[in-house]
Amino acid sequence: MAEGPLEAPFWRKGLLVAGLDEAGRGAWAGPIVVGVVVLPPGEYPFRDSKLLSPRARERLAEKVKEVALAFALGVAEAAEVDRLGVLKATLLAAERALLSLPLAPEALVTDYLPLPTPLPLLSPPKADEKSPTVAAASILAKVHRDRIMAELDRLYPGYGFARHKGYGTPEHQEALLALGPSPVHRKRFAPVAQAPLRFPEAP
């Protein structure tokens, strides 16, 4: 962020800026989680969650909660991803996160997510590398989703959800072929759709 944070022009105008980012868009299983964070103007140690170790993410998630003016999370379940598609489900999770925010932001920054909003919006690619607010949202979303996947690992053992977090790995592919899709797999994703059914279909 050598050129200054992405949200700096909004901060200079005195606007409350909410940063949003998601976790889980490309996973084969589990929800999409969107974090939203409002930070006061300043310099922060937050970086894209994908560049951090799990321990560092957990530590920084607590720091985000300490310094944020407000934060919230929104979730779109796997069944909603199947029904709506990835983009619309991500937008739904973002809407839920914003509705849960205890204050009203005056500008938004997202990581290339085209939110329909009347507010001033910046949504460049790789915003989580240029915006501490988006990076903070990324950290909260990733930590929350990882906890959900650890719980799903207990509910549906054998898939390795706690390790690969629902993403496509050789281990996950082998488990799908051996066990079939679980109720939290995204049936529209080709590797899942091609796996043999073992669980009963939801009504």
Swiss-Prot record:
Gene Ontology MF term list: manganese ion binding; RNA binding; RNA-DNA hybrid ribonuclease activity
Binding note for cofactor: Manganese or magnesium. Binds 1 divalent metal ion per monomer in the absence of substrate. May bind a second metal ion after substrate binding.
GO CC annotations, alphabetized: cytoplasm; ribonuclease H2 complex
First-tier enzyme category under EC: hydrolase
Keyword Cytoplasm: yes
Pfam families the record matches: RNase_HII
Name under which the protein is recorded: Ribonuclease HII
Species in which this protein is naturally found: Thermus thermophilus (strain ATCC BAA-163 / DSM 7039 / HB27)
